[in-house]
Amino acid sequence: MITAPNYSILKQYIIEELAPFWQKKEGVLALPIPAVPWPKAEPLPPRVKIVALPSWASDIGVNGNILVPEQFSDNADASALWATTDWFSTLFWYLNGIPERIFELNHGPIHSYSYRLAGWDQRLWEHAWVNRIAKFLRRWASMEAQGTEAEVCGSLPKTSILLTHDLDATK
């Protein structure tokens, strides 16, 4: 079992990790995002659901939607799920691969191979969910502040691609 950090630490971690999306972080920090308690155990395979974004942010999602872990979104009216989802916990969950870590604690390493996670929802790996959520939070902050995203959060980072190579150590 992996225990989630204190919520204020979790939130600060997310703000720092995704700082390129909000050079000005105050607008995102002020969003009325609920802090949903973490479950005592992570369900495996993870249970996920689609959250429809509001019309003013539908271009950010995949067909206007974001895939989130069920435990961080209540069972409110489907059109209001975006406002009752714990986006900071969702980001932490994705960034840290929480379900994969739990699986590895119980079954050994998967070495980032999703095929070893039989029965898991493949949509988890089909889109850049963290980036989409960060862009959604930028848009939401600008709506709340009645300004542009650039005014409220700063400019988006220039796109860059980093090529890396995964090295495995052996004796």
Q: Which ranges hold each PLM region?
A:
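Terminal accessory/targeting
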Residues: 1-171
